[in-house]
From Swiss-Prot:
This is Actin cytoskeleton-regulatory complex protein end3. Keywords: Actin-binding, Calcium, Cell membrane, Coiled coil, Cytoplasm, Cytoskeleton, Endocytosis, Endosome, Membrane, Metal-binding, Repeat. Component of the PAN1 actin cytoskeleton-regulatory complex required for the internalization of endosomes during actin-coupled endocytosis. The complex links the site of endocytosis to the cell membrane-associated actin cytoskeleton. Mediates uptake of external molecules and vacuolar degradation of plasma membrane proteins. Plays a role in the proper organization of the cell membrane-associated actin cytoskeleton and promotes its destabilization. The lineage of its organism: Eukaryota, Fungi, Dikarya, Ascomycota, Pezizomycotina. GO terms for cellular component: actin cortical patch; cytoplasm; endosome membrane; plasma membrane.
């Protein structure tokens, strides 16, 4: 068993990169991620394979967890930890929230099947379409608690063992049996864990007013009938997406959450025994809790100061004297002071003194130097123009005096 994992400091570093590219969005598309991935100087063929591995849910975009996977693969390739892009994603790199997608994909690769068809049409009025096979982590944890509390010595669940749960649900008996038949195509007296989780997921959606699906994804059916999932790396393929994330709230406040009453009776709420393998991102700081990236914050502060200085300079320059003419002496003095201030900032940035001391990295220093340098050049140009104007005014004054 490999003891590798993505360390917390890596996750924080990847977050800074991800947040700067995503601009507040939860996912990166290929064009947004291309700049940072191509900086690795890996070949396009390698980067394509890395993208396919990291895009666990196969939606063509990378969320933060998938971006961490991609970055770790790239760094391992660049640093020589990997000689080539692996054919499948190593178990230690699989995000826990997507482990079921990978497992189902591996089962499908071992035994591809066609969808199971349910012939009976559900014409119950008032039910909604839009059933989603994706299991949110909170729902999956609840399903596993119910499974752990009712499984037999072989790790299987019988239909009758969940009767107390059925009684607590707002689901007709015919629909419960229809869902059971859907996950138990071989009509076995008991079903395994994967089938149980799918069965409870169907009941959960039916409890919330959604129609029971008429088909099962082939990847799920394979895991039901095989009774176990093949974890041989050489036999696996990239996972197939099950569906998008759904809403976590019940459609009506009059109904209890699926299984809550039942779990409360059992006294096992919050004691699920299942621990998925892979990278756990649960300790990662969420978006709203992350501090702004230090570089962006300090850059915005510098820009705000520059704008304030420019506005003050513009205001003073345009302020008329008592005789209606601009005070060029004052303007020249202020321009020289601002130039001196910017040159001092530039010198501090180059020497690593003053504010530049506070742990700024080389890239930020270079960016600040370029920015301040451009500002200094602009001020010098502005000062030269003002000097020309001043000289022209003095020349006009002398000419006027000479004519008198």
């Amino acid at each position: 068993m490999s003891n590798k994992k993505i360390e917390q400091w890596e996750i924080e570093r990847y977050w800074e990169i991800f947040s700067s590219l995503a601009n507040g969005h939860p996912r990166l598309n290929s064009s947004q991620a291309a700049s940072v991935l191509r900086n690795s100087r890996l070949s396009d063929d390698q980067l394509e394979k890395v993208w396919d591995l990291a895009d666990v849910d196969s939606d063509g975009e990378l969320d933060f967890e998938e971006f961490c996977v991609a970055m770790r693969l790239v760094f391992d390739l660049v640093n020589g930890e990997l000689q080539a892009v692996p054919r499948v994603l190593p178990d230690w790199l699989i995000p826990e929230t997507k482990a079921h997608l990978v497992q189902a994909g591996r089962a499908l690769s071992d035994r591809p099947e066609q969808f199971e068809r349910i012939e009976d049409e559900d014409d119950t009025p008032g039910l909604k379409d839009g059933f989603d096979w994706y299991m949110k982590p909170s729902d999956k944890s609840k399903y596993e608690e119910i499974y752990s509390a009712n499984r037999n010595h072989r790790g299987e669940i019988t239909f009758e063992s969940l009767q107390a749960l059925y009684d607590s649900l707002d689901v007709p008996d015919t629909d419960i049996r229809s869902a059971w038949n859907l996950v138990n195509p071989s009509a076995s007296p008991a079903i395994n864990k994967d089938a149980t989780l799918a069965f409870l997921h169907i009941l959960n959606y039916r409890h919330e007013g959604f129609r029971i699906p008429r088909t099962i994804p082939a990847s799920l059916r394979a895991s039901f009938e095989n009774n176990k999932i093949d974890y041989q790396i050489d036999n696996a393929r990239p996972a197939q997406r099950w569906g998008a994330d759904g809403d976590t709230e019940t459609p009506t406040g009059r109904k209890a959450k699926f299984g809550d009453t039942y779990l409360s009776r059992l006294g096992v709420g919050g004691k699920g025994s299942y621990t998925p393998k892979g990278t756990d991102f649960s300790d990662t700081i969420q978006d709203e809790e992350w501090e702004k990236v230090r570089l962006r914050r300090e850059l915005s502060e510098l820009q705000a100061k520059l704008e304030a200085a420019n506005k003050a300079s513009e205001s003073r320059r345009d302020r008329p004297r008592n005789d209606g003419r601009p005070n060029w002496t004052l303007i020249k003095k202020e321009a020289l002071q601002l130039l001196e201030y910017k040159e001092r900032e530039l010198r501090e940035l180059r020497e690593g003194t003053g504010r530049a001391k506070a742990g700024q990295d080389l890239e930020r220093l270079r960016e600040d130097i370029r920015t301040v340098g451009e500002q200094v050049e602009g001020l010098k140009s502005h000062l030269a123009q003002r000097k020309e104007v001043l000289a022209d005014l003095r020349s006009q004054i002398e000419e006027e005096r000479a004519r008198r």
